[in-house]
Amino acid sequence: MSTWHLFSDSSGDGFRWEVAGRILQSVSDSTPTKALESTAPLPSMADLLLQGCSKLIEREESMPGEIPMFRTGLGKSVVLKESSIAKAKSILAENVAYSDLQNTNCSIPQTRQVDTAETMPMFRTALGKTVPLKESSIAKPLSILGSDMIIDSDNVLPRESGFGVPNSLFQTASNKKVNVSSAGLARAKALLGLEEDDLNGFNHVNQSSSSLQQHGWSGLKTHEEFDATVVKHHSGTPGQYENYVSGKRSEILNPSLKVPPTKFQTAGGKSLSVSAEALKRARNLLGDPELGSFFDDVAGGDQFFTPQKDERLSDIAINNGSVNTGYIAHEEKTSNKHTSNSFVSPLHSSSKQFRSVNLENLASGGNLIKKFDTAVDETNCALNISKPATHGLSNNRPLASDMAVNNSKGNGFIPRARQLGRPADQPLVDITNRRDTAYANNKQDSTQKKRLGKTVSVSPFKRPRISSFKTPLKKNAQQASSGLSVVSCDTLTSKKVLSTRYPEKSPRVYIKEFFGMHPTATTRMDYVPDHVRRIKSSNADKYVFCDESSSNKVGAETFLQMLAESGASLQHASRKWVTNHYRWIVWKLACYDIYYPAKCRGNFLTITNVLEELKYRYEREVNHGHCSAIKRILSGDAPASSMMVLCISAINPRTDNGSQEAHCSDNCSNVKVELTDGWYSMNAALDVVLTKQLNAGKLFVGQKLRILGAGLSGWATPTSPLEAVISSTICLLLNINGTYRAHWADRLGFCKEIGVPLAFNCIKCNGGPVPKTLAGITRIYPILYKERLGEKKSIVRSERIESRIIQLHNQRRSALVEGIMCEYQRGINGVHSQNDTDSEEGAKVFKLLETAAEPELLMAEMSLEQLTSFTTYKAKFEAAKQMQMEKSVAKALEDAGLGERNVTPFMRIRLVGLTSLSNEGEHNPKEGIVTIWDPTERQRTELTEGKIYIMKGLVPMNSDSETLYLHARGSSSRWQPLSPKDSENFQPFFNPRKPISLSNLGEIPLSSEFDIAAYVVYVGDAYTDVLQKKQWVFVTDGSTQHSGEISNSLLAISFSTPFMDDSSVSHISHNLVGSVVGFCNLIKRAKDATNEMWVAETTENSVYFINAEAAYSSHLKTRSAHIQTWAKLYSSKSVIHELRQRVLFIIGACKSPSC
């Protein structure tokens, strides 16, 4: 490790810094020495201290024992005592000779040698405890990193920086230095394709250093000596290591022709050797990816940069907007190209200095320079972006990058990094596919932001040839063109932080908290200019900021250029991307200025705010990968049915040809509006009801809508929102049942909170699917089965009848199949007996064995070939027989109408709307019936009457009835019960089931459902009436016995189903006469006044139970027990007999009691 010492300057009034190392040499009076800095990526502590100094130490008198060398940021002197210097030397010192300042006025430092033979206090713990380091510990890593680089105190290979330390050009990730031998450098040169004279192009540079001496530096060498530089001290001997240095220099620059094989490592760590010949053939095959065709017609002896005069290298500055460090970036120079570097004094700050290259004499290379200028001009024309003229910004002050480029162009010099469009300040790409590989320069530039996210190392041999490839020593600063910064391939993939607003360091303030009122509450617009009032979402992308002091105008193109100069990637921040976001930002800020003029006062719609918004959006979308709601829907990452808040930005938006769609009538459903989430937009088609709301003025531009359960039309594959808005083929499908008005301050995008259910009373029958609603269950009807008979015919049966139909269907199928099989077997035998002409060997054997009396004896005498043919033929015969039989059976069943039945189970549920307890208005809840197709087992068993449920996935059906009819699929619908605590917030809605007796049947209104338990007096025969099969059942319950009225003791129940010719199943069996049966869900009809009896009829939802223990009829259990007790009484038998005779009399007069 090198150390820095203080020396008095020549005048004796000031001080200067110099480097001290292991190798001590005398100072040459005739030729001042120069020390070039190391290219190591991690500077030493001394380097860091030197970088912090921004100007020369001012000369001032100091007190004895104090050295006024450092100052604070405010310019205040910091007293530095000798004890502080001693403490610093104890930290920075190594096992080398370092100087000791005896007093502040000494001009020649006195050198003393530190004895480090046993211990070397180079490392310390976190608590400050010294960790001894012996030379034996150093020998171990040296043996691993390179046996030919053993360090001793007498013979040390000087590195390029001139420090007397090992040639540690590379460092590991933990800052451990890795020594590189000459053989390693030769392999690196063979890998990078360098020729023997690649480093000889700098021999023409003069060794003058007059400009550097002006700053008090005398320890720096010229480019000619950069590879063999040593630090010469006053106490050394001149020329002590000249022979050694010269030999090493020639060994590095002119290696032998026999280059050792280059070794690569695979991802698994396996070492592979590649010879120089193989690499040469690979380069010949792939071509030179860096130079292309620029040097095809240039003579090999031409030098691009051959200055003949004494030039000041420190005057060459290449500035790309970053702060220059105190390092000298060394670069390998080839015979065909040259890139100059700028040296900055450690005591000077050059972050804002612009210098020019004074090139007076150039070699014969003018033709080549013209080629480079032509290539750069073609690159600028390809970008086709003009220089920005921003409003509110200085148009006369050139950019730092432009100044550097202009200075370079003026001298006929264009940096090679700019020519090839690649950054020159980044390390070599990893070619081993290993993450633990150490590089010589593995740190990013100090002015670059750290890349966000994970980085991936990919072998450059697997990349396209257009990918950039550069050596670790290339440190060129990237130049900017006169119009737009050149963005290379590496810069496109980087994630440079443009905005510090995200992530937010403090809670964000939203418009409701900032403005505190609805936009329509303000009417004064005195502060809003006319051109701002005319801004709409349709023309916001064309808006430009005008500079009052000049005729410059700033629009979307200018902001694109600003983003690119800020470091944005043109791959992501494309022209379409910037124009789209510029449109929505301008429209939003203009709306703030228009609707809140008193508070905004025109300070929102400014260039600064627009640029900051663009940077913020780039940071979130590109660097952090955040996507808005519309972008996620179009990319397929989120369903369109998700709940989101969007804003109406335009009605009937423009199509591709710019024409406007005409307004549709009230019955039209293809009216489109443009919706935006603030970042992107897409079209949306309105249904019939929403179209009526639009025509009535209830939908307008600027209104926010809460959308849930929307559909997506025209979408097939992931699509960019910038392309979708142009094609206008993809649109959202909105319906009124899933579209609600949102609060004016609601945030756009997906909603994190749970959506509020739509009130059951607000559901429109033709308003599309209902995303979520809340209702109470009043009745759950039994499971029914619907069979589709073809030709749009179907029949609905109860569970009991369906079981009988299944049994009857299976019996008919079995009888038909048995008959077909018997006939088929006889037909097959007859056909086989007549097949005497079959010449196949297996068929002959089969026929012989079939007709033989003792086939076993014949088989015993057969040969192996005969048995094999017989077995094969028999297998074929059985398979053909089985296949033909199956086809015949299927055809016969199809002809007989006994094929597979298409039956779907379903259940009906009666719902009612809810009314809040806080509602003081009229309580008129709406009723509805939901049909669940293919209900799940959970829905069959867990749904309970009297509970409130949150339902999802219901679709209303068009109906003119006051009752709302909906349907749903069992697998797609969701039924979530509401908690009992929340259910208490609604008014009661449920009337529990209870048995009705004949004595109080008159209290029930007509067409109402009721349940009754009754004694079956008589079961009539089934008959057909107008395409329906009917059957009458007469029952009584004995409730009128105490009053002595016989006239009102009968109830006639009509069972009816659609007529079917093949159905011989009756509703009620005659065996039920004399039994007590429970009837549920009967409909009350008008009373038969002629025969003085009550009348009721059944529907598809009606059901009866013989067993009162059934769960569905449990409420009839007590009433059924009382009726059974009454029927067993002796007095009741006469009443039952009299009622039966009366029924027979009515039936005898006509076939129907209604006659």
Curated annotation (Swiss-Prot):
MF terms (GO), sorted A to Z: DNA binding
Superkingdom of origin organism: Eukaryota
Key words, A-Z: Cell cycle, DNA damage, DNA recombination, DNA repair, DNA-binding, Meiosis, Repeat
Phenotype upon loss of function: No visible phenotype under normal growth conditions, but the double mutants brca2a and brca2b are sterile due to aberrant chromosome aggregates, chromosomal fragmentation and missegregation during meiosis.
Gene Ontology biological process terms, A to Z: double-strand break repair via homologous recombination; meiotic cell cycle
The BRCA2 repeat ranges on this chain: 63-97, 116-150, 163-197, 257-291
Disulfide bond positions: none
InterPro entries: BRCA2, BRCA2_hlx, BRCA2_hlx_sf, BRCA2_OB_1, BRCA2_OB_2_dom, BRCA2_repeat, NA-bd_OB-fold
Recorded GO CC terms: mitochondrion
Keyword set includes DNA repair: yes
Signal peptide from the UniProt entry: none
Tissue spec: Expressed in flower buds.
Assembly notes: Interacts with RAD51 and DMC1. Interacts with DSS1(I) and DSS1(V). Can interact with both RAD51 and DSS1(I) or both DMC1 and DSS1(I) in a tripartite complex.
Function in brief: Involved in double-strand break repair and/or homologous recombination by mediating RAD51- and DMC1-facilitated DNA repair. Plays an essential role in both somatic and meiotic homologous recombination. Is crucial for the formation of RAD51 and DMC1 foci during male meiotic homologous recombination in prophase I.
Name of the protein in its database record: Protein BREAST CANCER SUSCEPTIBILITY 2 homolog B
Source lineage: Eukaryota, Viridiplantae, Streptophyta, Embryophyta, Tracheophyta
